Amino acid sequence: MLLITDRPEQSAKLERLLSLWGRCDVVDLYRPAAGDERPQRLLVSDVDLSKRAAVEAVRHRLAERRYRKTPHLCLLRDQSPRLTTQANAIGASAVLPADLPSKALLDEIGRILHPQGWAPMQRHFVAASAGMADMLSAAADGRALPVATIEDSVDAINRAADDHDLGTWLDMVWTHDDATYQHCLLVAGLAAAFACELGFPEEARRLVTCSAVLHDIGKARVPLAILHKRGKPTREELAVLREHPQTGYEMLLRQGAFPREAVEAARSHHEYLDGSGYPRGLKGDEIPDVVRMVTICDIYAALIERRSYKVPMPPEAAYAALVAMGGKLDADLVRAFRPVVLPGPA
């Protein structure tokens, strides 16, 4: 996917949202095109079409042969008839307001990319991704987290878990190009499937999934240069990363709109039963059951994810690594987690 914009310094949220569909390349409208630009499934323009120079620059960019048959979604900052006509004149396949809510934007992109219709799992995934995007954007900007949107994401993830098709969920998660979104969606999907496997009633399932959705909210305040670094973090960068549990806890506590267990999961999902975790070195019964579940899902997710500095573990090896952690994790819950990721006889 290619995002063409005249305000690249303000495009981070949109880029992250578009990365749901795979790699999103961002192009500054007024800079020469890079020689390695690849064919794209969709072009998205976020440009002020009230400026003649911008219109001509977009027209010139879209005239390149490789883009002539590529769908073009034009985001308008002003929905006036004149600019809508201008967007159509430069070949827009669809025109939407630039401030459209994330869910509506992703729905429209889905219709463009999948004109034959979506499978239910895709709809659940898009709804969850849109909520995740709004949540992380609000956290990064220091705004109140969108409670209703987060609740909608939790519902979407739980409905996806009802289908007992974790493999399809994982396949869609892997298409997301942003590592933080990918990890949050992966942990949330695993946690929802875990609660479903344990036969939890609906309210308990919502609590577990909500805790997983929010567990890494503190990472929204970690500099992107550290989060997106190609390679292992330095000691100093690791120290910054290790602040995210306390940051997330304080953020959720301050807003006062989330379950106590979810707030605790944000702070304690890196704690271990033997006291070797962080940030507080909790032991045993000091770590609630919901947090123990999220921790298992978080570790498993990290093991099967691909990063620039490591290859992903296959499911069997990742589960074996959980077992090998012994007294750090709840052994009963680790055993109960097995059917979630390794269906079939033990």
Model region roles, listed by residue range:
Residues 187, 207-222, 233-335, 343-346:
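Alpha-helical scaffolding flanking metal-ion-dependent phosphate/phosphodiester catalytic sites
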Residues 25-27, 192, 276-278:
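Short gly/ser/thr-rich secondary-structure transition/capping motifs
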Residues 1-173:
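Non-catalytic interface/linker regions that flank or bridge core catalytic/transmembrane domains
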Residues 112-115, 340, 344:
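Phosphate/oxyanion-binding loops and surfaces in catalytic or ligand/nucleic-acid-binding neighborhoods
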Residues 114-239, 250-253, 261:
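Acidic/His-rich, divalent-metal-binding segments that scaffold phosphate/diphosphate chemistry
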